[in-house]
Amino acid sequence: MNKKRKQKTYLRGIYAERLAGLWLQMKGYHIAARRFETRFGEIDIIARRGHVIAIVEVKARLTIEEAMEAVKQPSEKRFDNAANIFLARQPDRKKLRLRYDLIAISPWKLPRHIEGFFHPENF
């Protein structure tokens, strides 16, 4: 991939993550972290609503189906490891419940938020 194409892809990802964050806020979530980095990898968005911590992967693709297919099992393990690091830092962690979501961004469509898209115990 050439440098210009990489930059375009990066910027598309940034735009998709911002749009996803706004969508979550409109649904009543508080954005706790964006691009949360650990030694295991990065989580696009960590959002909270009540006692639910949503670990959100954002995928921008031409169709919702392509976005759903873009999440792979090794990524899911990365999310779980990074999510546990975030959770360990929360003072009320015993009351919190983790959920792993996907927000699919497609051109000319509203974002699609799929709650509980994957479950780490299925790895």
Region spans (language model):
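Acidic-basic catalytic patches of nuclease active cores, encompassing PD-(D/E)XK
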Residues: 1-34
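Active-site metal-binding core of divalent-cation-utilizing nuclease and nuclease-like domains
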Residues: 26-53
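Catalytic cores of nucleic-acid endonucleases
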Residues: 2, 60-108
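Positively charged, solvent-exposed patches that mediate nucleic-acid binding
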Residues: 48-49, 93-94, 122
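Short, C-terminally biased terminal segments at protein or domain edges
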Residues: 106-123
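Residues forming the ATP-binding cleft of Hanks-type serine/threonine protein kinase domains
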Residues: 36, 59, 117-118
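Conserved catalytic cores of phosphodiester-cleaving nucleases, focusing on short active-site segments
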Residues: 43-66, 79
